[in-house]
Every structure is written in structure tokens, then in C-alpha cells.
């Protein structure tokens, strides 16, 4: 990847994860990474840890940037877009990791056409995430390559042609860790209920999750086939799965993900209804 200057607007956990990944993979030099945050102490902390250049002024941070990463909370987006409008360098790529912020909203808000919208998930903070992303028509092939390499530093990445997939990704992978944690929590609590000390129950569940995923990835078979391998006729797995099916767990999971997808679509519609008009 060519060495480019990257300005982060907002320097929270996800921005820090991107900085760590970029430096770890030697995709950028510290002096070419600019971190803007209204909290001066946060910028100084990032400078001390990673050698990046801190800013409290967003316009100063983006002035010489080849890429601008929007990594702020959604409730701050409108104000930041208004502040940056007309000031993004013409050649620069804007990469957003803000949930629910559409390409149209960002492009209109900034008066800038080169936009990439992403949907990462929280494991990206440790380089184990999955990020789904889409690019506007104005983004060049070279900029797409830059984005792909940067997002790869957060874990896996999937490029899609249709922005509609971002709402689906929000419900499946973006919100997915919450489903996994809830299932883990239920299993851990069941272990404690049976009599295990909590620390042992946690270790058993965590390694079972980790090992099951790794085993699945190393075997080129359908996940249902692996489930059948551990489900002996009349055995404990068959009994447990019978109760899960009887309780409608499979249907509940499907409906929950569909509900999250519908909510993501609703938030997008609400966003369109509340886009402020220029005066």
C-alpha cells in the first residue's frame, strides 16, 4: 500500500484499533497519522502510545490528508459534517465507520463525492473483526485498494456493490457479537447452576466456542453435519437439542436478526426524514 496521510475525526476505540493495525502491518508511518479529538488529553495519549500527530481542530487535521476517517459517535455526525463541508481536500477519500450513516448523507453533508461506508463489529478492536464495506461511484480503484488493506488490519473484510447489504450486515455481523455473548452468558450461568465455580464454567464455555469455530473452519462441511457428528441417538446432545428446538430457539434467532435488519432500515428512513435543509 502506498504511504498516505490519514486523518481520524474522532479517536475512540475503533480509531485506535485502526491505528494499531496500520502500524502493526506497516501500512502507514506514525507521522502520517493525524488524530483529531475535542479532548486534548486523548490526543496526547495516542501520541505517546503510537507517535501519531494529535489535533483538537478538525479542519487543521484534514488539511493535508489523503484519507479522512469518520470515527465519531452517530449523534455528533451532523455537526461534524457541517463543520467539514467544503473543506475536504478534493482528492481525498472519506471512509466512515459510523453505524447507519449512508453514503448519501455523508456525501451531501460534506459536499464531497469520494465516500466509503463500512460496517465493522467490535472484535475489530483486537484485529479479529469482520467489516462489510461499499464505495461510491467516485472512489478510484487505487482508493479501494487502500481501503481494503486498511480494513484488513481490523480482521476480515467483505466488499459489496450494493449499499443495501450494509443494513443486512448490521443485523448479522454488526450486532452478531451481542447474540454470541448472550448465548455464552446463558451457558456459563447453566454451568454455575449445575455447580461449577464461575471461573471454571467461563473457561469451559469460552474454549468450547473457540474450539468449535476453529474446528468448523478446518473442515469443509456444512455446519449442520458437524452438529450431527456430536449428536448421538438417545444421547445428551440429542436431548439438549430437542429442548432447544421445542423452545423455538432457532426461530427466535432468525426472527431477532430479521428484527434488527428491519430496525436498521427504519433508522435509515428516520435519518432521511431528519436531514437538515441548507439555509
Residue ranges and their predicted role:
Residues 150, 156, 168-171, 229, ...:
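Residue-level recognition of specific faces of alpha-helices
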Residues 40, 49-50, 58-133, 137:
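Rossmann-like NAD(P)(H) cofactor-binding subdomain of soluble oxidoreductases
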Residues 115, 166-171, 223-228:
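Short pre-catalytic strand/loop immediately N-terminal to key active-site residues, enriched for Gly-Thr
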Residues 1-56, 60-63, 129, 192-193:
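NAD(P)+-binding Rossmann beta1-loop-alpha1 motif at the extreme N-terminus of oxidoreductases
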Residues 2, 206-279:
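NAD(P)-dependent Rossmann-like dehydrogenase/reductase catalytic/cofactor-binding core
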